[in-house]
Amino acid sequence: MTPIAERPTDVASRTVPGHWEGDLIKGARNRSAVGTLVERTTRLVILARMEGTDAVSAREGFTRTLRHVPAALRKTLTYDRGKEMAKHERLAQRLANQVFFADPHSPWQRGTNENTNGLLRQYLPKGTDLSGYTQRELNAIAYQLNTRPRKCLNFATPLEVFTQLCHHSPVALGT
């Protein structure tokens, strides 16, 4: 388990894209979950349907979802120390990225993700059975958040900024 203190310094500055924060939001009686991923530079949100709340479900859900992101834009993932990330080594191996863990009881170290989880509760209220949501429905929710202008992005949307990086920035993509 690699602590956040060993994370590259460019992650904190948000100047280099490809660094993600991840978490699970849990549903009714902690029996269902949705994986949340937020890219730190662009604030792009990706939601992953989970089959359960265990480590295998988290690994499979995050792997399935992050495989659609260009390799150059999935460098690191910062997570809390929840038991659902017990299989993080296999996730890192499958995606060829590094996984870092925030210090215990330090949600501010993943503030972008915590803020996003709060925004998601507008669409996925606490106490909801999240297992009933399809990946298509989760993608529609993520689209709503990704097309919302953000002050921190000079009122561009996360989707606009991320798309621009994917299509127009050879430096950001390492090509």
What residues fall within each predicted segment?
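Short small-residue beta-strand/loop micro-motif enriched in glycine and branched aliphatics
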Residues: R43-A48, F101, K126
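RNase H-like two-metal-ion nuclease catalytic core shared by retroviral integrases
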Residues: Y79-A92, F101-L124, S131-Y143
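Short catalytic-loop micro-motif centered on adjacent basic/acidic residues
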Residues: L47, K75-T78
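Mobile-element integrase/transposase regions
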Residues: M1-V34
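Active-site beta-loop-alpha junctions of metal-dependent nucleic acid enzymes
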Residues: K26-N30, L47-A71
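Coil-to-beta-strand transition motifs
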Residues: N30-S32, R40-V45
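C-terminal domain-tail junction helix/linker
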Residues: K126-T175
